[in-house]
Amino acid sequence: LFKSWFVDFDPVRAKQEGRAPEGMDEATAALFPDSFDESELGLVPKGWGVVRLDSFVELAYGKALKAENRKAGPVPVYGSGGITGWHDHAFIEQASIVVGRKGTVGSLYWESRPFFPIDTVFYVKSRKPLTYCHCLLKTLGLDTMNTDAAVPGLNRENVYRLLVTEPPERILAAFDSVVSVLRSSMDQNERQAETLATLRDTLLPRLISGQLRLPEAEVP
């Protein structure tokens, strides 16, 4: 959906050709223009702006948390490679996007729970829907923006200078209303997978060692 609306501009092209945009109702289709303007990024839908990424996105620094200082708890701890452990309290309480800063440069992780991003990552603060920002960041090639040969690193000032289109708020709201439902379903599936993985990691060693035995099947 993101690629169709914000990269290929399919609804705009359809209206320009006199066709009804596919996969949307009339009210949503009416939000899109039927022509393009020239811009620094090439053709963009008429009335859409072109802005620097930092006009609506902030990459905030995570906080140092050594492994020996972590206390067992339900809060995921994020490094640039993803979840590196768990802690008993969060640094960030609301949903956000984790961006790899050192190590795995430009890695992206969505997290809807309270979490703890450590100092090898950024976390996103945004003035636009987080669902939109997550999809947008995936298209910007952050993983190719390494600025340090010795220790791979992402310079946020280089990210901030990137130019992106700025769709109207009503279109972003329409996009978010669709994608947030899908995102919620994905979050639930991920939580279930984590629960099953925890059960596996807890029970399998006990089964292998003989500490836990399955009931023998009854033979009639």
Where are these regions (language model features)?
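Non-catalytic DNA-recognition/assembly elements of restriction-modification systems
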Residues: 1-4, 26-79, 169-215
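Charged, glycine/proline-rich intrinsically disordered loops and linkers
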Residues: 14-32
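Extended, domain-scale alpha-helical bundle/helix-rich regions
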Residues: 1-4, 8-12, 18-19
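Short, hydrophobic secondary-structure boundary micro-motifs
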Residues: 146, 215-216
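Alpha-helix initiation and N-capping motif
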Residues: 9, 50, 130, 156, ...
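A short beta-sheet element
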Residues: 79-162
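Charge-rich amphipathic alpha-helical interaction elements
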Residues: 60, 165-167, 220
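A glycine-rich, aromatic-flanked flexible loop/lid motif
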Residues: 110-111, 165-171
